[in-house]
Amino acid sequence: MQSPVLLQLLLLALMGTVSAQFGGFFDQMFGGGGGGGGGQQQRQEQNVPSDSAWYRSNVDAAVCSNYLCPDTLACVHFPHHCPCPFPDHEDKFELAEGQRICVSRGGFKAGEAARKVELARKGLL
């Protein structure tokens, strides 16, 4: 009679060990929710929607009596005064037509982005 009880206890102990060791793996592989662990659930943040509604709502909420920069939503007097979205990684160049472009510094030597912009202006690039 002791054998079935002992076997059940042994199986129960093994299931707890397997759940403790592999519970996180199974939760990640199969979407969580079930079994083992301490019942912890991770809450993931929502991605912004893939349509333009989020952007439009931010544009509509922006208050600007001058020019609202489309990429940074900064309020400036003239379009060529718009800042770059990532000023730590981009150089800003004002074009002759009163517009500006932002060029990634991405691994270029100092002044290399400016040289490439100048070559492009001349049609050599």
UniProtKB/Swiss-Prot annotation:
Probable component of the endoplasmic reticulum-associated degradation (ERAD) pathway. Residues 1-20 form the signal peptide. InterPro entries: LCL2. Keywords: Signal. This is Long chronological lifespan protein 2. One of its GO terms (biological process) is ERAD pathway. Belongs to the LCL2 family. It comes from the Eukaryota.
